[in-house]
Amino acid sequence: MTAVKEVPRVSGGEEEHGHLEEFRTDPIGLMKRVREECGDVGWFQLADKQVILLSGAEANEFFFRSSDSELNQAEAYPFMTPIFGEGVVFDADPERRAEMLHNTALRGEHMKGHATTIEAEVRKMIEGWGESGEIDLLEFFAELTIYTSTACLIGLKFRNQLDSRFANYYHLLERGTDPLCYVDPYLPIESFRIRDEARAGLVELVQDVMHGRIANPPKDKSDRDMLDVLVSIKDEDGNPRFTANEITGMFISLMFAGHHTSSGTSSWTLIELLRHPEFYAKVQQELDDLYADGQEVSFHALRQIPSLDNALKETLRLHPPLIILMRVAQDEFEVAGYPIHKGQMVAASPAISNRIPEDFPNPDDFDPDRYEKPRQEDLINRWTWIPFGAGKHRCVGAAFAQMQIKAIFSVLLREYEFEMAQPPESYQNDHSKMVVQLARPAKVRYRRRVRD
């Protein structure tokens, strides 16, 4: 360690829990200030923890290249244990976690079947829409992406046994990610109480489905989904290996990142297209041309829509699903001449890095053409274009989330015209929880398209 400089501290945070209250109300404002005052490496106080925020290519590269044994993820997210349950993914050791997350449903050959499944789910959701009406984006996309995620990642059989209660409980669970978890994830506050009740509700729903599966085991292999497999596993004494509580935890962990990514990004993609009618028209025309011959939504077709692809990338840059990624240092390190000590929290912020003006000119503008040759700003800035992280820590579900969103819009934009039902600037994110969600109201109007 040759570092001699001390990591600079950002201004503010004189209260008992340091910058916690500001982090709960305006996290992006706080992190912006860290970069403005301290540069690529600076720290803020989160309850009793110092969080060293890294930004810019060099510091981010260190963050994303580090292994779990160097910068540990599980320790950095105390809110995950009450949501997932003990021993599931975030509590598991890195090898077990890699094995659990390398779910077959996310492999290439399975992705091909998912496109058709997602198209069917979208059509099911909109079959009662009629000629025109209004939807709340958060409500619609949160429910739709619960069904698409469960159908693709767990199985259609399980999906077909769900109703809107599953989506409602799941939404409440995501709201239980208040940064107060850095003081104590079991504090007696309302959002944590609701979180625990919602999780118990999910366990009950899964338990009911499990009872049915035990009473009526699958006839053959083609009738089995992931739940059947988990229910059939026995321990050495011949008893069921997993409880409903554990299986619910596995399902939550499987869907957690993918669901809120797909739900929030779908909402923001539509909002940004509505704010920029010329791009909306371009994307719609591209879809009309692609599907003009009546082909179904397929994995193959979804690889041929560059305008929608670019609009989606730009939406992800401006509205990343996670605004901060955290780890805990397991050793002593040096980054850009600054020391990082064992036990300190280290963070990277997609919300900050994605808008560095030197890398992304006019960073606040929605400009999908940034991804066209020769600019290709996502490829040139591989350590600062980080809506899904980067390097070995790139989100495991990134390809699935992007494919899912493209499949959703392949149906919606061909069947309906959309328009804003409130002022363009009134659509905002709610940053009061670690899982960012759209602030309500977030309504749009739709009317069925008239075909020539």
UniProtKB/Swiss-Prot annotation:
Sterol 14alpha-demethylase whose physiological substrate is not known. Accepts electrons from the iron-sulfur ferredoxin Fdx encoded by an adjacent gene. In vitro, catalyzes C14-demethylation of lanosterol, 24,25-dihydrolanosterol and obtusifoliol, to produce the 8,14-dienes stereoselectively. Monomer. PROSITE patterns: CYTOCHROME_P450 (PS00086). Residues 1-20 are annotated as: Disordered. It is an enzyme of class 1 (oxidoreductase). One of its GO terms (cellular component) is cytoplasm. Belongs to the cytochrome P450 family. It is found in: Cytoplasm. Heme b binds at Q73, Y77, R327, H393, C395. Transmembrane segments: none annotated. This is Sterol 14alpha-demethylase. Keywords: Cytoplasm, Heme, Iron, Lipid biosynthesis, Lipid metabolism, Metal-binding, Monooxygenase, Oxidoreductase, Steroid biosynthesis, Steroid metabolism, Sterol biosynthesis, Sterol metabolism. The keyword Repressor does not apply. CDD domains: CYP51-like. SUPFAM superfamilies: Cytochrome P450 (SSF48264). One of its GO terms (biological process) is sterol biosynthetic process. One of its GO terms (molecular function) is heme binding. It catalyses: a 14alpha-methyl steroid + 6 reduced [2Fe-2S]-[ferredoxin] + 3 O2 + 5 H(+) = a Delta(14) steroid + formate + 6 oxidized [2Fe-2S]-[ferredoxin] + 4 H2O. It comes from Mycolicibacterium vanbaalenii (strain DSM 7251 / JCM 13017 / BCRC 16820 / KCTC 9966 / NRRL B-24157 / PYR-1). Its cofactor is heme b.
